[in-house]
Amino acid sequence: MVRLTIDGREAIVPEGSTILEAAASLGIKIPTLCYLKGVNEISACRICVVEIDGFERLVPSCTEKAAEGMVVHTNSHRAKTARETNLKLILSQHDGDCTTCVRSQNCHLQDLASELNIIDNPYPRDVRNNEWPANSYLIRKESKCIKCMRCIEVCDKIQTLKVWDVKGSGSRTTVGVRLNRAFTDADCALCGQCITHCPTGALSIRDDTAKVTAALEDPEITTVVQVAPAVRTAWAEHLGLTREEATVGRMAAALRALGFDYVFDTNFTADLTIMEEGSEFIERFTHRDQIGRAHV
């Protein structure tokens, strides 16, 4: 075990623990942005920097290991100033039009700017616009990307599909599809993990809400909605309903009230789905050496 002092409090943590983990064990929150435990630990954003007695420079707490006798200051003037400066530099290259962003009020970067009380930014704006076509399944907006590399790491380490990669160098660094392929040619499974872990609105799914609304308002169109089993749980969580409150009948009634002509539950074909996915897995497993074990 390692014994150290953080903000005047003693912490005892297992050897190999980071300062970030040691602080968390005391209930001390150190702001982070690019960090994803066990997935993305590259200290790229430098938001989690802390001051350590005897260290000339500030260090990123997400990668710096706790050491015996270490004295850490997570909220010193020097650490706070560096943290705010680093965030302002990130914001200077970010499209800050939050009112039209799909992640507004659910954005890690927005929350962090509020937490650190970032009101003005003296740094000149350098925002690059390279938005994907609106008809793509997945939408990427370079103007929102902060180069945290979360999407790259979660796709590599969790999904093992390696769709994303770093492109360019220096100030021109960005994220794109590996090997400069078109997104349609990548091995993307459309799992949504990169969207879920993106801290901004740089990645999102295509929004067809306007098309659905138009179809519901058109008397010449018969509208049908088919609900997957997972949705029955997801909608309840979003609205804060209990399992008893979130009945299938209640959900179907809400969809009918919206104007859908027919509402179906995917349960009635679940057996076919299982057979199809099972057959696909057997095919992939049988030919795993040809297609690569990572894609099984």
Task: Outline where the language-model segments fall.
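A short N-terminal beta-strand-loop micro-motif at the entrance of redox/enzyme domains
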Residues: 9-15
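Short Gly/charged-rich anion-binding patches and loops
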Residues: 18, 108, 150, 193, ...
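Fe-S ferredoxin-like electron-transfer domains
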Residues: 46-190, 196, 203-222
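Short alpha-helix boundary/capping motifs
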Residues: 13, 145, 188, 245-246
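Short glycine-centered, acidic/aromatic-flanked micro-motifs in structured strand/loop junctions
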Residues: 8, 177, 227-229
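Iron-sulfur-associated redox domains of electron-transfer enzymes in respiratory
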Residues: 2, 15-69, 75, 79, ...
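Eukaryote-biased recognition of intrinsically disordered, low-complexity regulatory segments
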Residues: 1-9
